[in-house]
Amino acid sequence: MEDEFEVTIITQNGDDFHERAGSTNVIHLHGEALKNASTLHPYESYEIDKNNPDIRIGDKAPDGSQIRPYVIYFNEDIEQRLWKASVEATKQADVFIVVGSTMLVYPAAELLKMIPPKCELYIIDPSEVTLPEGCTKEYIHIQSGASRGLEQLKATLKLK
């Protein structure tokens, strides 16, 4: 979609699928599995050594502490820099698209409550959807898988 629209992707996935698909403006709320951090500075990422990608107890980060994956584990806080960027992108959106999410994982589900009044909300999911509690935004549900649903939405948006 970036070839025709300004797009910011906010993802809870730790993989690099969006980048491999050509997306350039991706906010990884839960970190990136293909990067490392340290136990001392878990929000400062650096590239994994491609020749030695495994992490072992005793492997040291540049700051001397244990290496860890650059991901957010259950009950860990999201990096505030990434959360603020997500909130800002949401508040500036003309169109907000949710693809294949239960909308139950917080704090990401809170973003739906921050969508501007004039912003259109589209939800692409083959199943029935329920907005998070407290979110009363009207939405258009494209009951489809991600690829087909995004193609359908792209065609719709091009007509506007």
Residue positions per predicted region:
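Conserved catalytic alpha/beta core of Sir2/sirtuin-type deacylases, generalized to analogous enzyme cores
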Residues: 1-160
